[in-house]
């Protein structure tokens, strides 16, 4: 099994609490850098679970185009800010968060009331600004999922009628870059050096994201290690007619020869092969000409010959 090292050569936390990690995998066999880099990037961007707000209910609001007294943002702006909220959930169950604030106030994610299973990644994330007479009360739905889920207009997926659905961005990984460099070993063998750069929203560290992506790939490939290939079952064929089942009518003999054989209880080719030429000549009214006719018919139509000696009967 090929062995390689994985080194985290750089990490940092961004201003919005997003995280960056840079990893180097080496030495890899030639071509494996591209294989691993491409596969890991696709899984990192598409298959990792994340958490997002999927629906919001705002007191006094029944559609997304409304405005609210004493609040700088309209409802669409508030929904957009909630959509960009970065959360980390430790449960797969749907959770409910709440917000109740009175102006004047600059509302951020730190003001949200969240279940114990849910954590805000960036507490300073901006939501709205309230004037002195402003008041904002809302309830929002939190879910785990993968990728990007667009809402279906006219479908509320079972949510209460006064909930406003939001396009959900579950992806915890924002961006992935990978590069492959060729290098030569001490034995002058060409090898790959894979560099992976991972940017996350902060709900996962780059190390966690890489580990989860690798596990998903392994789980997808493991069944291929255990698969057993069985040859396709051959279609059942009906047993071909044996010589014993071919009636003497198939030999198309003359009436004289045919009647003589029938009177001697010779009904099939198998019966006929119990007789030598001398035996046939002993049949009443069966002459040399009839014997030659039978011998020729057996050879031409069946590729068979009469035995030289009488077969031993079991």
Curated annotation (Swiss-Prot):
Catalytic activity: RNA(n) + a ribonucleoside 5'-triphosphate = RNA(n+1) + diphosphate
GO cellular component, one term: DNA-directed RNA polymerase complex
Any GO BP annotation: DNA-templated transcription
Entry EC number(s): 2.7.7.6
Sequence segments annotated as region (Alpha N-terminal domain (alpha-NTD)): 1-228
Keyword flag Transferase: yes
Keyword terms, alphabetized: DNA-directed RNA polymerase, Nucleotidyltransferase, Transcription, Transferase
Top-level taxon of the source organism: Bacteria
Molecular function via GO: DNA binding; DNA-directed RNA polymerase activity; protein dimerization activity
Region (Alpha C-terminal domain (alpha-CTD)): 241-314
Enzyme class: transferase
Record-linked SUPFAM superfamilies: C-terminal domain of RNA polymerase alpha subunit (SSF47789), Insert subdomain of RNA polymerase alpha subunit (SSF56553), RBP11-like subunits of RNA polymerase (SSF55257)
Complex and partners: In cyanobacteria the RNAP catalytic core is composed of 2 alpha, 1 beta, 1 beta', 1 gamma and 1 omega subunit. When a sigma factor is associated with the core the holoenzyme is formed, which can initiate transcription.
Job description of the protein: DNA-dependent RNA polymerase catalyzes the transcription of DNA into RNA using the four ribonucleoside triphosphates as substrates.
Family per record: Belongs to the RNA polymerase alpha chain family.
Domain-related comment: The N-terminal domain is essential for RNAP assembly and basal transcription, whereas the C-terminal domain is involved in interaction with transcriptional regulators and with upstream promoter elements.
Protein's name in the database: DNA-directed RNA polymerase subunit alpha
Source organism: Gloeobacter violaceus (strain ATCC 29082 / PCC 7421)
């Amino acid at each position: 099994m090929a062995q390689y090292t994985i080194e985290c050569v750089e990490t940092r936390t961004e201003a919005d609490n997003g995280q960056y990690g840079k990893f180097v995998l080496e030495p890899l066999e030639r071509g494996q850098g591209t294989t691993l880099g491409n596969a890991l990037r696709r899984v990192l961007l598409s298959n990792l679970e994340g958490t997002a707000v999927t629906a919001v209910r705002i007191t006094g609001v029944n559609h997304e185009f409304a405005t609210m007294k004493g609040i700088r943002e309209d409802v669409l702006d508030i929904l957009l800010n909630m959509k960009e909220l970065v959360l980390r959930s430790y449960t797969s169950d749907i959770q409910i968060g709440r917000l109740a604030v009175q102006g004047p106030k600059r509302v951020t994610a730190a003001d949200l009331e969240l279940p114990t299973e849910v954590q805000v990644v960036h507490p300073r994330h901006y939501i709205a600004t309230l004037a002195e007479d402003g008041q904002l009360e809302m309830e929002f739905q939190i879910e785990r999922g993968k990728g990007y889920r667009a809402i279906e207009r006219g479908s509320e997926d079972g949510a209460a009628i006064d909930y406003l659905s939001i396009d959900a961005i579950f992806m915890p990984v924002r961006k992935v870059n990978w590069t492959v460099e060729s290098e030569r070993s001490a034995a002058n063998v060409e090898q790959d050096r894979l560099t992976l750069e991972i940017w996350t929203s902060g709900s996962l560290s780059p190390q966690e994201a890489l580990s989860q992506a690798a596990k998903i790939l392994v789980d997808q490939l493991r069944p291929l290690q255990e698969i057993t290939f069985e040859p396709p079952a051959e279609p059942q064929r009906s047993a071909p007619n044996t010589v014993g089942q071919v009636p003497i009518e198939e030999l198309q003999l003359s009436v004289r020869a045919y009647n003589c054989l029938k009177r001697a209880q010779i009904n099939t080719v198998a019966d006929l092969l119990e007789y030598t030429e001398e035996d046939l000549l002993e049949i009443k009214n069966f002459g040399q000409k009839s014997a030659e006719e039978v011998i020729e018919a057996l050879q031409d139509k069946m590729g068979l010959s009469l035995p030289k000696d009488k077969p031993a009967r079991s």
